[in-house]
Amino acid sequence: MTDEEQNSLLNILSDEHTRNILQETMKEPMSADELSEACDISPQSVYRRTDPLTEHGLLDARMEYDADGHHYRTYTADPTQIVVEITAEDINVAISQQERMTDRFIEFVNHVRNQ
């Protein structure tokens, strides 16, 4: 990760509402309206925070459709852990991502099919 990317990520994570969005979406996938209610911020504020989180790979956005055919996005936090290491020489930000059970199952099925 470049210094510019690290600085951008640290800036994003310095916001309390952004951290709340990450925590809420670690529990379960949530729409912007659900996040608005859970984090006590406007839907516009949710979008202002989910866009950079998605760009940095910290949130996964997925399109969902309701029974009436209307579409909306749900967000799921991707990182398992974000570690900031500060030394006298450098600052490093590391993101470790948990392999999801569904991803492991799909990989297993594909492996079985190829044999």
Q: Where do the model's predicted regions map?
A:
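Short, cationic-aromatic polyanion-contact patches
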Residues: D3-H17, S31, M63-I86
